[in-house]
Amino acid sequence: MRNKVRKIHMIGIGGSGMSGIAEVLLNLGYEVSGSDLSMSQTVRRLGSLGASIAIGHGRENLGDADVVVKSTAVTSDNPEVVVARERGIPVIPRAEMLAELMRLRTGIAVAGTHGKTTTTSLLATIFTEAGYDPTVIIGGRLNAYGAGARLGQGEYLIAEADESDGSFLCLSPIASVVTNVDADHLDHYDGIEAIDDAFVDFLNNIPFYGVNVVCLDDPGVARILPRVNRPILTYGFSDKARLRGRIIDSGAMSCFEVSLDGKRLGEMRLNHPGRHNVLNALGAIGVSLEVGIPLGTIAEALAKFAGVGRRFERKGEKDGVVVVDDYGHHPAEIKATLATARAVYPERRLVVAFQPHRFSRTKALFGDFCTCFEAADELLLTEIYPASEAPIPGVSGESLGQGIRQVTKTKVAYYPDFAAMEAALPGILRPGDLFVTLGAGSIWQVGAHYLESERGA
């Protein structure tokens, strides 16, 4: 019956969770069409691979699709969803399509509020180094592939599992990684208890012969572990973790020692900075050891790791100012990114441009956002990236700036749009600065435009 489906339409095809699935489907020989609100490099890439993509959503985009896949951000009143249901065409979430792809392979899924993309990418790098030729689907651009997906011929499918709407429960992996369990996506979940319940169900969804590799350092993970009835391998810096890391040296590269059940395994070098990325590496090491990949192969892969797009990505330097871009948009991610910035560039003044992501997240975590920028010398705020959400009265980039000023000494400036922020940059940035653009929306454009502008302008 699977052969009856040949034409697949994807609404929001350019999104981080959708584009990788689309690329794998194209490589498998399916006819893929889709729509997205705007043109992007990702949309252009998918078009070059054979996808037929419309810019904007409309009833006419659907064509004669056999199934419609929608991203988390797409609502039930989307015209393409409406016409599909009128015609009796199945409309499924992206996780259900990912689950179908996973049925064809041995699945490994990486979940967690933060660190999913990097951990998934590290696993992909290790499995590729080991000659396993995995299929990989991530929510970012793995620099080694130049894309967020890769169709391999091997046994394993390694994928990022999206907890944002609970649809990661569609997946049936043989092994999982959970990096952390934190308060986020409160537009979908009623509270932290509901988030805990979803992660417990996810961990208990693996078979009895599988394994869950989980970060014991995270309080949320530690909180739910007593409710998990499947095999567990804990990792972290804690002396209670079975797979334990100890940082030896940190900087542009991270050097750390690894031990398992008290036995020293050796030293690793990760071609990526940050304490949080050592934790991500430990999660990937845990799964790799469970599969049977030799320690030497793991070490070689970590040393070669080329990184992930928009994860503390050095974009360039102009007039003595180093520009780094990062996807971080949750307070915990922001703190980790700024700590990394301080560790890698300790002598530089830290100027941060932040675009909040979603009105619901900004409202729910307002207090945490007010205190997470304390490591910055200067903070430039712009308006909230809505991600299809309607505005919430009293919640804005400007109100966030007011809140930050009340509780920290960080210098804060608010700009209603990118144009205003970019116009102010020449008077703010000076030689020796580190300029970090932060956010899940389009704030990266500010750094890109600064680097592209005339030198010294």
UniProtKB/Swiss-Prot annotation:
Which pathway features in its UniProt record? Cell wall biogenesis; peptidoglycan biosynthesis
Pfam assignment, any one: Mur_ligase
> Is Membrane given among the entry's keywords?
no
Q: Which InterPro entries match?
A: Mur-like_cat_sf (IPR036565), Mur_ligase_C (IPR004101), Mur_ligase_C_dom_sf (IPR036615), Mur_ligase_cen (IPR013221), Mur_ligase_N (IPR000713), MurCDEF_pg_biosynth (IPR050061), UDP-N-AcMur_Ala_ligase_MurC (IPR005758)
Alphabetized Gene3D superfamilies for the sequence: Mur ligase, C-terminal domain, Mur-like, catalytic domain, NAD(P)-binding Rossmann-like Domain
Give GO terms: molecular function aspect only. Answer: ATP binding; UDP-N-acetylmuramate-L-alanine ligase activity
- Localization per Swiss-Prot or TrEMBL: Cytoplasm
Please name the top-level EC class of this enzyme: ligase
Task: Please indicate if the UniProt record lists Cell cycle as a keyword.
Answer: yes
What does it catalyze? UDP-N-acetyl-alpha-D-muramate + L-alanine + ATP = UDP-N-acetyl-alpha-D-muramoyl-L-alanine + ADP + phosphate + H(+)
- Keywords for this protein: ATP-binding, Cell cycle, Cell division, Cell shape, Cell wall biogenesis/degradation, Cytoplasm, Ligase, Nucleotide-binding, Peptidoglycan synthesis
The UniProt entry, under SUPFAM superfamilies, shows:
MurCD N-terminal domain, MurD-like peptide ligases, catalytic domain, MurD-like peptide ligases, peptide-binding domain
| EC numbers, comma separated | 6.3.2.8
> What's one GO-annotated cellular component?
cytoplasm
Q: Provide the family line.
A: Belongs to the MurCDEF family.
Q: What's this protein's name?
A: UDP-N-acetylmuramate--L-alanine ligase
